[in-house]
Design a protein with these regions (language model features):
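Mature N-terminal segment immediately following signal peptide/propeptide cleavage
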Residues: 1-11
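Membrane interface segments of multi-pass transport proteins and intramembrane proteases
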Residues: 15-31
Length: 230
């Protein structure tokens, strides 16, 4: 099933998303494109801040709040990443990462339609990212005419397209691989471990079954050798 969804995503990308992103890159100069990316990232900062707190990362929460205030004011509603220039780099946090720090396991690997690689925990986390986002909830309170679901979906779609634009060359290289599904899965697991452990993932422990297989392979190889004749 995952491979089928992956192939669906690849065809959709080739037929729709890649041509659209190519036109966007050709027509829109780099500076405005970067501005869009900056604004979308800045709108995610309140949710990053909440997840920092939920993970009891108070220092990172303070940095996130400071970055949001600076970029929203001096950076003109997030158009410019002024925080980078004053030494407050961006970091990513989402509810999937929060669940991981609470001890919730990965769950099965999933490939979601249009969204790409995920797992059971992160799929639930993605739903929380959409429905509990404080910016969308605040806008809904300010103007009741705005439909919360429509607003959240629109933002999610813009963020997904912006990600496709930023990964334009990377995705082209991925689809040239002999088995892009396996490569995408491996990259996903590595990236999520990197994010969950704030850039310092522990060394993976060797699986006991892998150890037993290696030992059995060594025994089989030894038994297959002809006995030395005196």
């Amino acid at each position: 099933m995952n491979r089928a969804v992956f192939e669906f995503n690849r065809v959709t990308d080739r037929v729709i998303l890649k041509p659209l992103s190519s036109v966007y890159i050709t027509v829109v100069p780099e500076a405005p494109r970067q501005g869009v990316s900056n604004v979308m990232r800045n709108l995610r900062e309140p949710w990053v801040f909440i997840n920092d707190l939920l993970q009891f990362k108070l220092d990172r929460a303070g940095a996130t709040l400071g970055r949001f205030i600076i970029n929203s004011t001096v950076g003109v509603a997030g158009l410019f990443k002024v925080s980078d220039e004053v030494g407050i780099p961006y970091h990513s946090e989402d509810f999937g990462q929060t669940l991981a720090t609470w001890g919730i396991g990965d769950g099965p690997y999933l490939v979601l339609p249009l969204l790409g690689p995920s797992n059971g925990r992160d799929a639930f986390g993605f739903a929380a990212n959409v429905y509990a986002d404080p910016v969308s909830l605040t806008l809904e309170e300010i103007d009741d005419s705005k439909k919360f679901f429509d607003l959240s979906m629109t933002r999610t779609a813009i963020e997904a397209f912006d990600a496709r634009v930023r990964l334009h060359t990377t995705l082209d290289e991925l689809y040239k691989e002999d088995d892009p599904y396996v490569v995408a899965r491996s990259v996903y697991w590595q990236r999520r471990r990197f994010e969950i452990y704030d850039g310092n993932p522990p060394e993976p422990e060797e699986d006991i079954f892998d150890m037993l297989e290696e030992e059995q392979a060594a025994i089989d190889a030894e038994e297959a050798q002809p006995e030395n004749k005196q």
